[in-house]
Amino acid sequence: MRGFGELITAMITPFNKQGELATENCVKLAKKLVNEQNSDALVLSGTTGESPTLSTEEKLTLFQLITEKVGGNANIIAGTGSYSTKETLELTKKAEEVGVHGIMLVTPYYNKPTQGDLYKHFKTIAQKTSLPIMLYNVPKRTGVDMSQDTILKLAEIDNIIALKEASGDFNKIANVIRETRGEFDVYSGDDISLMPVLSLGGTGVVSVASHLIGKELKEIIDAYHANNSRKALELFQEIYPFITALLVKTNPIPIKAAVNTHLMQVGSVRPPLYDLSEKELEQLSEVYKWSVGKY
């Protein structure tokens, strides 16, 4: 196993009925993801964790709590990226102080930096932390697409060790994997792209669906890396309907609803996102029961 691992769960953030951070349920969920769903690592305060609506205090509470309670059994990756280099540096320093194992840095959003700006942004942060870094490219959300050349330049920096790639650009993914020759981990940035990314030499996935089908996803990855691509594909086809059903609305609305229904209480999403309707929840649950029948 390399770097952060192969199956990384982008953990949702549990809230109570008042919409506040539910610390006990955060720990409970993290333990389930590691002990029952076979997650090698957890990303905290990412897109799935509703980072835009978490305060800095809530993020640090989450980082420290999960690192203390679960960090002995899984890598804890703190989502510290933002559209401000200064704020990213400040949160990264605090995350390092509480003991996280690595950080995930999304490309700065809204202000649309150039490729040169992106390189300077990430290099500046890498030079001021000892933590290993996963870059996160998700242009549909950020408005900026990190180019192949920028990624390859950044991969030369010692503590930039991985990429979560959610652009769907498989040509870019193939070229980055080929050029870095096994020295840089590339992860599928969404569950639906897991098989093509593995086929190109990718390490694994930063997953949303693994909250409920982590064991299946880990089995797929293990089968593929054991040169049993037929088994991996067959397993993937079984869970594919549930993976696509999670795309019915903006992430993390569907997965939070599914976890509430089939695993444990994690509360509602925070505005400006809103929960699934009863009809949407019923449809999602039917797909889940049908495609993941043993649960």
UniProtKB/Swiss-Prot annotation:
Top enzyme class: lyase
Catalyses which reaction(s): L-aspartate 4-semialdehyde + pyruvate = (2S,4S)-4-hydroxy-2,3,4,5-tetrahydrodipicolinate + H2O + H(+)
Coiled coil: none
Keyword vocabulary terms for this entry: Amino-acid biosynthesis, Cytoplasm, Diaminopimelate biosynthesis, Lyase, Lysine biosynthesis, Schiff base
Major subcellular location class: cytoplasm
Entry GO terms, CC: cytosol
SUPFAM superfamilies attached to this UniProt entry: Aldolase (SSF51569)
Keyword Lyase in annotation: yes
Subunit structure, as described in the record: Homotetramer; dimer of dimers.
Full protein name: 4-hydroxy-tetrahydrodipicolinate synthase
Species in which this protein is naturally found: Natranaerobius thermophilus (strain ATCC BAA-1301 / DSM 18059 / JW/NM-WN-LF)
